[in-house]
């Protein structure tokens, strides 16, 4: 569990790292004890042509440990900290035999893309965007899957901005990445951070007494999934992310809860990241499905497969949700043109 850095990062504190962290397209800065590796939305992952002095690394780690008042040495091998937009993880050289390891991940307080940019990037077909926007309007429960670094959280953040401001949203995270009050300014929101003495299960149970319309869990892991599905079963809506390589595997990823998945998870979206031979990175919606439990049978309706719209068949219970929300045509979002004009 990371500790929050009290002060905001400065160019002086982050030194060589800041040169890359200050670039909007950079998402990760990783140092493996010898080389500096950069993950860039446009250029992909590359080794930076930088010499990293040992003195700088020593000064940097000492600065971070002071900020969170935590020792970093042979006896305390892990140092983790957050700023408002950075998540920092450091492993001591006594454990990392290749040399001290530093990973810095950026989590910006804004949505990286607009609807127009997603269409230009071929993130998904326009009909799929319409469908997902209508799913938000209808209060569906979403699970965003993908491999680490695929862009699950960024995709979830993008669709969260379309939740109506009067609907109370509670976010639950260990490292602050969603920044809901920033991406949906003026909305009724409560942002919870779990830690010692207040774990995910505690936060989820406490949230139910806070009159939420939506309950957002940054990442679904182990025991907290049970509590999350229990809350979703009460009529609270929500988003979460999970490590996954196929939406059809979701029921198997969450043990002993197969029927609840089909009953209380409505939409699963798989985000895929690919890299071309010239190093260009592309992220896109590879799969989209609806889960449904019909006549005591569990069913999966694949809507998008291999990045292409393959079916327009909507389960009856999902169609009912659309109808109750005033959505007559699931693949046509009546607010889409307005969202485009607003630059969302």
Give the residues covered by each predicted segment:
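NTP-binding/hydrolysis catalytic cores, primarily Walker-type P-loop NTPases
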Residues: 1-16, 284-344
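Phosphate-interacting basic helix/loop segments used at nucleotide- and nucleic-acid interfaces
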Residues: 4-27, 68-75
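P-loop NTP-binding catalytic core
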Residues: 37-138
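Hydrophobic anchor at the beta1->P-loop junction of P-loop NTPases
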Residues: 144-146
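Walker A (P-loop) phosphate-binding loop of P-loop NTPases
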Residues: 149
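Switch/coupling sub-region of P-loop NTPases
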Residues: 158-264, 272-273
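Phosphate-binding/switch region of NTP-binding enzymes
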Residues: 259-295
